[in-house]
């Protein structure tokens, strides 16, 4: 039956559709009731003929109201059980009608939870989802853009023309459209038309995959299809207190750890060759390793070194390599530089198989201004504050999230849960927390707005961080949440129910700066700076601290760790060994940046890879061997980690020998009373008869010595250990007389009492 219904209103609708100004295509397109019949209207730009195909009939549709609105009349509601055959320029194809799939994807409860900021799994609704509706395979698109005039899906499916697939606006500023026939790997973006008539092409904020830079489109990708094999790991993790475990972290940047030749085969997890991703223009002939290649190389390397965790600098999709990953545009997608999301899942799964946890750097403090990203998303300051005194980091050239907006907080909190849920990560390190906590961070007077109490604290950011940590531990009780917080803000690692921020670890930035300042001093002048290496204990038990020597300390002219050290090469190596050993024996969990474990000489360069050729030289092998043995010692001796955050776990023997730059202390394990004695000599002068007090008589075995020849040292030591003498010193009746090698750290363990 072919009946044309002439409606003046449809001419206006057609005009608005053709100009991408229509926010409710479902009101006119698809099956529409008309008296006792049904009109089927199809929007098909640039089509010359459209035919409706049902199981019973075929109808050539007419376009009496607008050249691209085709319609016909049926006796009954066909639902979405029909197809349309389209002729464009003599080329025909058959498809299902997107506007016949009218059921709301985002339900009332979903909208309510999202609007109040409490939808912890919002990614299961937002974004592009491969799904089936009424036995029709396709993709459901769902986007939050409340101030947009219209939103269209664009991609290869419509030659990136926003006129073809306008989305339907729902309650709460949600836009939806189901497009049948799309499949995994298809590219798409959202074309957003603003109230002022401006048009933006935006990547999907909730996209699960994006193109390799410099391309910017989102990629349709499956979730929940990967077959995990780490159930035992996850169960064990979530049923123990991570703070009562040894934690030794290898911080790394996947793109600059190691490169491969562009001539080497570049093969994905399906065994398919694909175009290599260049490492950088400044390094022609090299390419990035894939997630699969990284798994094959990084995991055995880290396991051999003895680290318990890998911390990855941000791998959320980001357009600019030079940002190191800290300017994110694809929050719900691992970067495609190294492969697909499932290939990253396989990387994590392989880490867990080998007993290695994964920590990701997470950057909820700011985002870049890239046009395809979150900035000015729907023609309004949707994700950021509108006032630059609140919403912009001018020094960084980035924007600040509006933490007071529920939907924005929801975006971030759900993103945190997403990485644990979808990629089985074990922890996060939150970058630049201080920049979130203080409204005047890096701002001169007059360029920030005080809070309601007249102070500089950002209460909105505080509440966001508390919510994020509370929700994280609610879902994943064994997780690590680490704050990079560089000030003295109180309660960073206190639980949220005690008005803390809720992290369970905080980088000890003060320790890091004091240590590096101290070790850069000529050893003969260190006697005047003894406080640098002892002061950290004064505040050590106020927070749950992690000691970190991070990437920030080996860039921008600061030199790599080895080259910070004074003296000739021998002293540089010895100082490096001593610093690392002091770090491993000091209370607190551990993190070092890649390259430090073998004495990298050059500053870290994001465009280059590490100086692996240095391992051809014995001193660098020695540092690597030292780190291996430190990690093994650390994991083997509970006194070095079980009591990190309790004053009982640490006791000075002597911290006042400034003249010799020597310190001595004990680490104690609370369950069986075992303890270790640590003695550090931070000058090149060895001491052949250096006496320290000890709490119990007997034999003290020397279980570690940074001056051992296997590490590149001079091999001075104590012939395996020393027995005590009844000689009162440092408040103890018993003492041992030690040989202290130059620039060294000794670890001794009480073995037996005298008869």
Curated annotation (Swiss-Prot):
Catalytic activity: Transfers a segment of a (1->4)-alpha-D-glucan chain to a primary hydroxy group in a similar glucan chain
GO biological process, one term: glycogen biosynthetic process
GO cellular component, one term: cytosol
Residues annotated as the enzyme's active site: 431, 484
Gene Ontology MF, one: 1,4-alpha-glucan branching enzyme activity
Domain of life from the UniProt record: Bacteria
SUPFAM superfamilies in the cross-refs: (Trans)glycosidases, E set domains, Glycosyl hydrolase domain
Role played: Catalyzes the formation of the alpha-1,6-glucosidic linkages in glycogen by scission of a 1,4-alpha-linked oligosaccharide from growing alpha-1,4-glucan chains and the subsequent attachment of the oligosaccharide to the alpha-1,6 position.
Recorded family membership: Belongs to the glycosyl hydrolase 13 family. GlgB subfamily.
Record protein name field: 1,4-alpha-glucan branching enzyme GlgB
Taxonomic placement: Bacteria, Bacillati, Cyanobacteriota, Cyanophyceae, Synechococcales
């Amino acid at each position: 039956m072919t009946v044309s219904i002439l409606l003046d209103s449809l001419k206006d609708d057609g005009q608005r559709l053709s100009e991408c100004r229509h926010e409710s295509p479902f009101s006119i397109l698809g099956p529409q009731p008309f008296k006792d019949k049904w009109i089927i209207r199809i929007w098909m730009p640039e089509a010359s003929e459209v035919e409706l195909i049902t199981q019973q009939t075929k109808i050539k549709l007419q376009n009496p109201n607008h050249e691209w609105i085709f319609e016909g009349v049926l006796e009954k509601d066909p639902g979405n059980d029909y197809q349309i055959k389209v002729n464009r320029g003599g080329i025909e194809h058959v498809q299902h009608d997107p506007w016949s799939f009218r059921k709301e994807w985002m339900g009332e409860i979903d909208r309510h939870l999202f609007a109040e900021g409490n939808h912890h799994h919002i990614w299961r609704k937002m974004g592009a989802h491969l799904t089936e509706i009424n036995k029709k395979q396709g993709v459901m698109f769902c986007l939050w853009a409340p101030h947009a005039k219209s939103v269209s899906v664009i991609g290869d499916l419509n030659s990136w023309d926003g006129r073809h697939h306008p989305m339907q606006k729902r309650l709460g500023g949600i836009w939806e459209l189901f497009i049948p026939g799309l499949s995994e790997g298809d590219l798409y973006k959202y074309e957003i038309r603003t109230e002022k008539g401006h048009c933006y092409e935006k990547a999907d904020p909730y996209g699960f995959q994006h193109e390799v830079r410099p391309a910017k489109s989102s990629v349709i990708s499956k979730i929940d299809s990967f077959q995990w094999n780490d159930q035992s790991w996850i169960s064990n993790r979530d049923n123990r207190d991570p703070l009562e475990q040894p934690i030794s972290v290898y911080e790394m940047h996947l793109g600059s750890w190691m490169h491969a030749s562009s001539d080497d085969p570049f093969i994905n997890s399906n065994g398919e060759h694909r175009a290599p991703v260049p490492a950088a223009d400044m390094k022609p002939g090299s390419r990035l390793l894939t997630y699969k290649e990284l798994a094959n190389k990084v995991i055995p390397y880290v396991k051999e070194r003895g680290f318990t965790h890998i911390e990855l600098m941000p791998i959320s999709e980001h357009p600019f390599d030079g940002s190191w990953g800290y300017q994110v545009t694809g929050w719900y997608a691992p970067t495609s530089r190294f492969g697909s999301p499932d290939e990253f899942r396989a990387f994590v799964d392989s880490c867990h198989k080998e007993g290695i946890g994964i920590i990701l750097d997470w950057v909820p403090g700011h985002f870049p201004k890239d046009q395809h990203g979150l900035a000015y998303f729907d023609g309004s300051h949707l994700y950021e504050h509108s006032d630059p005194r609140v919403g912009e980091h001018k020094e960084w050239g980035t924007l600040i999230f509006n933490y007071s907006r529920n939907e924005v907080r929801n975006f971030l909190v759900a993103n945190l849960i997403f990485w644990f849920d979808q990629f089985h990560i074990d922890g996060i390190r939150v970058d630049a927390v201080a920049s979130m906590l203080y409204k005047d961070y890096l701002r001169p007077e007059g360029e920030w707005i005080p809070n309601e109490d007249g102070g500089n604290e950002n209460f909105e950011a505080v509440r966001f961080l508390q919510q994020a940590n509370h929700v994280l531990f609610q879902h994943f009780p064994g997780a690590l949440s680490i704050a990079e917080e560089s000030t003295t803000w109180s309660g960073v690692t206190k639980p949220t129910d005690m008005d803390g921020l809720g992290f369970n670890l905080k980088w000890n930035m003060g320790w890091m700066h004091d240590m590096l300042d101290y070790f850069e001093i000529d050893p003969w002048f260190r006697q005047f700076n003894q406080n640098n290496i002892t002061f950290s204990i004064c505040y050590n038990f106020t927070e749950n601290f992690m000691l970190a020597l991070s990437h920030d300390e080996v860039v921008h002219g600061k030199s790599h760790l080895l080259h910070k050290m004074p003296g000739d090469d021998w002293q540089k190596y010895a100082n490096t060994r001593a610093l690392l050993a002091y770090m491993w024996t000091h209370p607190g969990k551990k993190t070092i940046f890649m390259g430090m474990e073998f004495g990298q000489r050059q500053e870290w360069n994001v465009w280059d890879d590490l100086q692996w050729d240095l391992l051809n030289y014995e001193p660098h092998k020695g540092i690597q061997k030292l780190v291996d043995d430190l990690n093994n010692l650390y994991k083997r001796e509970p006194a070095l980690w079980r009591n990190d955050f309790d004053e009982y776990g640490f006791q000075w023997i002597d911290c006042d020998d400034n003249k010799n730059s020597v310190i001595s202390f004990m680490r104690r394990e609370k369950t069986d009373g075992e303890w270790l004695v640590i003695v550090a000599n931070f000058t090149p002068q060895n001491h052949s008869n250096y006496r320290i007090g000890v709490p119990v008589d007997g034999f003290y075995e020397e279980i570690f010595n940074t001056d051992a020849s296997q590490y590149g040292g001079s091999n001075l030591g104590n012939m395996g250990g020393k027995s005590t003498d009844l000689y009162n010193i440092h408040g103890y009746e018993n003492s041992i007389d030690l040989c202290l090698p130059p620039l060294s750290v000794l670890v001794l363990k009480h073995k037996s009492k005298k008869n």
